[in-house]
Amino acid sequence: MEGHPDIRIIAVPYDSGHPDRRMGAGPQHLLDNGLAESLRSDGRGVSITTVRHEREPPAEVATAFELQGLVSRQVRSAIDEGQLPLVLSGNCNTAAIGSLAGAENPGIVWFDAHGEFNTPETTTTGFIDGMGLAIAVGHCWKEMAKGVPGFNPIPEENAVMAWVRAVDTSEQERFDASGVVVVGPDVEGQGLRALEDALDRLRSRVELVYVHLDLDVLDAAKVGRANEFATPEGMDVEQLEAALDMVRERFDVAAAGIASYDPSFDTDGRVLRAATAGARALTCPASL
């Protein structure tokens, strides 16, 4: 469609290096249930590429960075061909680091229940997917990240984390000492206004952003559980769509990612429908 780019969906069906299980089952479930068709309904072309690693047996850390590199190449290729990359990933770090590298380091607007700001020195779980933002701003795994084509750390001030509400003590200390802007859950109706203010400040620094949607940003009670880590006090669908519209009104979106969807927790399909609405809001300008 003239004026609106075609979309390249980049599916990365892995959770901690393991294919097609837990959150790794999310990308294909979204595709099997009409995500691409919904995006095509506006008349734009939508192509689908699935990324697979060759590491056997998978090692979580090494595989994570291998997948990031594969995503980076796909994102770069899509942009070079005039397409909008939309990464569907089991894990956040794969979509985020790969997209940031492939898009040559735009700003970050990241929707997530969790801070993703631990490092190997602060984590109590060893879960690399709790370190995605820390990797993005150059706080950890620096040598491994150098191997991702196109990656350079993002300045902390160029990152906005939205609706974060499940943060470790060590993560909070790290946020307090950083330039990352953190917008918490909606309090007395001020959440969207606070996000709007944060986006306005970010707009004074960057024009191009990567938008990341971890589906556990959604309210576990009002919408449904996206995964085992889902929590209350999240966004409802209307808030999510309004927030994504705010982003599209202010920035050019270089790439977008949707992550952390475990279909086994979505027993009534409400998260699936919310994810589809989010994908449309991420990729379709309001004028479409």
Positions of PLM-derived features:
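Conserved alpha-helical scaffold segments that buttress catalytic/binding sites
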Residues: 2-288
